[in-house]
Amino acid sequence: MKKMLIQGGNLLSGEVTIGGAKNSTVAIIPAAILAESKVVLDSVPHIKDVNSLLSILEDMSVTSTFTGDTVEIDPTNIVSTPLPSGKIQSLRASYYFMGALLGRFGKAIVGLPGGDDIGPRPIDQHIKGFEALGAVVTNNHGAIEINAPEGLHGAKIYLDMASVGATINLLLAAVRAEGQTVIENAAREPEIVDIATFLNNMGAKVRGAGTDIIRIEGVAHLYGHNTHTIIPDRIEAGTYLSMAAAIGDGVNVKNIISEHMDAYLAKLEEMGVKMDVKEDSIFVYPSPDLKMVQVKTMPYPGFATDLQQPLTPLLLKAQGEGLVVDTLYPKRTRHVPELIRMGADISIENDVILLHHADKLQGAEVSADEIRGGACLMIAGLMANGVTTITNASNILRGYDRVIDKLTGLGAVVKMVEE
């Protein structure tokens, strides 16, 4: 495990380029095994989760190379291997191998997923959908076994909640199933559109991605053709926008699709953050006078749950009393006691985060227990007086592309060392 050392108080300036979307990439890499030829991905983020997924592919005799920002995956000689534990349990996105293996082989054995501890994230909607497609699902000592001995068939599936993970997993399973599948109350995130585009470019027939009804006409084969460029990471972008507003002296955040961030940008504007929003970049001006706001996370196109923690340090700079309510993951609050160690006036009451203006944070030793909480502490450390040490900082590397290089490029004094 690594720790991050931050010398706080240095104003950031310059420009930073956002990488490809983590939440697209970690689904598209498992989806690549649905193809019967080589797949090429561009704008792939340099994050730990990508390396973990490529390692899992290697266990299935799928070869890959990662050069620059390009990943080539060749599933030609894939072997249907059980993935019961070990690597598979280190990241939540590993559960996309359920849908991908089921779609490719009609069977899968995958360990229950790990990832960030941000509260309960059950996979019952995934299982319900697999069963509707004709699969039998059992839990065997912590591994999910899925079998469709008579093959998968199209079905009408209504999701009880608009789950991103379930929508993607069912999309992967249904894309080579016989007949038409309709997913109702589907999640609408931009990453789902990206994944559907990737599949369609290989010959899939997916319509309606980005709406709450997705229709999939099953096809027999998929083949990699053109290079697929992954969309920019709206969560990474939001993190750097918050950072730029909190401790920036003029920062240009490049490679952004601002339409993917409407709810977040509206909240920044409500706070009084001064921005120049262009087609593919956002310039953030110094914004000394900020107004406190209330934040409520919602499924897309609402305010993203992954951005409530990166926004929190900026909220602490604002005048007044604010609150954060995470309707998706109410227990996503482990960053709060760490911020208190740094002198923040912040508390939790009935899963609601209450905030007041903090004149100045102080450097401290804090723990990054998950990706976005780590990003929150990273921004707080940049704002604080003195040195902040973030333990368990490997979690930050799971979700943020070349974060040390990007921070130092903006003028931050920061380094990553082994614990």
Swiss-Prot record:
| Primary subcellular site in the record, as a coarse category | cytoplasm
Compartments (UniProt record): Cytoplasm
Q: Tell me one GO molecular function of this protein.
A: UDP-N-acetylglucosamine 1-carboxyvinyltransferase activity
Q: What class of enzyme is it?
A: transferase
Query: Which positions are catalytic residues?
Result: 116
Which residue spans traverse the membrane? none
Positions of phosphoenolpyruvate binding = 22-23
**Which family does the record assign?**
Belongs to the EPSP synthase family. MurA subfamily.
Q: Which NCBIfam families match?
A: murA (TIGR01072), PRK09369.1 (NF006873), PRK12830.1 (NF009470)
What GO terms in the biological process aspect are recorded for it?
cell division; cell wall organization; peptidoglycan biosynthetic process; regulation of cell shape; UDP-N-acetylgalactosamine biosynthetic process
Spell out the protein name for this chain. UDP-N-acetylglucosamine 1-carboxyvinyltransferase 2
Catalytic activity reported: phosphoenolpyruvate + UDP-N-acetyl-alpha-D-glucosamine = UDP-N-acetyl-3-O-(1-carboxyvinyl)-alpha-D-glucosamine + phosphate
Keyword entries, A-Z:
Cell cycle, Cell division, Cell shape, Cell wall biogenesis/degradation, Cytoplasm, Peptidoglycan synthesis, Transferase
Q: What is its EC number?
A: 2.5.1.7
Q: What does this protein do?
A: Cell wall formation. Adds enolpyruvyl to UDP-N-acetylglucosamine.
Cellular component per GO?
cytoplasm
- Record CDD domains: UdpNAET
Q: Which organism was this protein described from?
A: Latilactobacillus sakei subsp. sakei (strain 23K)
Q: Where does UDP-N-acetyl-alpha-D-glucosamine bind?
A: 92, 121-125, 306, 328
Database matches in InterPro entries:
Enolpyruvate_Tfrase_dom, Enolpyruvate_Tfrase_sf, MurA_subfamily, RNA3'P_cycl/enolpyr_Trfase_a/b, UDP_GlcNAc_COvinyl_MurA
